[in-house]
């Protein structure tokens, strides 16, 4: 059994989603958004760090999966996103979590089937895959999709490792 916290970083809204993986079975544990309403960036980063740290303390995940930085059209936006990612990663590393990074297009392709999926499609598939009664908020759905992607690739790695080390495998 593995508990994964997925993080969709943002300087104004950081989504998080927590799922438990037991073999191929995924269980939804929680999700939400850390919203920073202040204007100065250092305070926003402090709030993101504190929020992610609190979530980790509450749910005790085994690892963190986070979205990789993509190059935004606006360099200032890319820098702010990188800073938000950085404090989220530090929150995980400070609590001894291994951190795994996934590109947004890979997450969309894994969860929806196409790397060009929109937010509504991601929300719909996350709701379906986790058997939720309602769609999560967009940023929380993205974070859950990142965690689901980690489960998918983690399961693939486990199967590959079993084939390589199992002397009974043909």
From Swiss-Prot:
Keywords: Cytoplasm, DNA damage, DNA recombination, DNA repair, DNA-binding, Endonuclease, Hydrolase, Magnesium, Metal-binding, Nuclease
Coiled coil: none
Pfam family, one: RuvC
Matching Gene3D superfamilies: Ribonuclease H-like superfamily/Ribonuclease H (3.30.420.10)
The UniProt record lists the keyword Hydrolase: yes
Catalytic activity: Endonucleolytic cleavage at a junction such as a reciprocal single-stranded crossover between two homologous DNA duplexes (Holliday junction)
SUPFAM superfamilies per the UniProt record, alphabetical: Ribonuclease H-like
Cofactor requirement: Mg(2+)
GO molecular function: crossover junction DNA endonuclease activity; DNA binding; magnesium ion binding
Subcellular location: Cytoplasm
Protein name: Crossover junction endodeoxyribonuclease RuvC
Organism: Pectobacterium atrosepticum (strain SCRI 1043 / ATCC BAA-672)
Lineage of source species: Bacteria, Pseudomonadati, Pseudomonadota, Gammaproteobacteria, Enterobacterales
């Amino acid at each position: 059994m593995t508990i994964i916290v997925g993080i969709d970083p943002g300087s104004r809204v950081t989504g998080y989603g927590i799922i438990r993986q037991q073999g191929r079975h995924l269980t939804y544990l929680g999700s939400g958004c850390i919203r920073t309403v202040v204007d100065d960036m250092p305070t926003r980063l402090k709030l993101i760090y504190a929020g992610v740290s609190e979530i980790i303390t509450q749910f005790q995940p085994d690892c963190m999966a986070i979205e990789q930085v993509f190059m935004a059209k606006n360099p200032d936006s890319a820098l702010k996103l990188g800073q938000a990612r950085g404090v989220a990663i530090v929150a995980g590393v400070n609590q001894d979590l291994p951190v795994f990074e996934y590109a947004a297009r890979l997450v969309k392709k894994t969860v929806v089937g196409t790397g060009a999926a929109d937010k509504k499609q991601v929300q719909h598939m996350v709701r379906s895959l986790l058997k939720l009664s309602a769609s999560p908020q967009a940023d929380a759905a993205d974070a859950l999709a990142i965690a689901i992607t980690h489960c998918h690739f983690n399961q693939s790695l486990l199967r590959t490792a079993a084939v390589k080390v199992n002397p009974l495998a043909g």
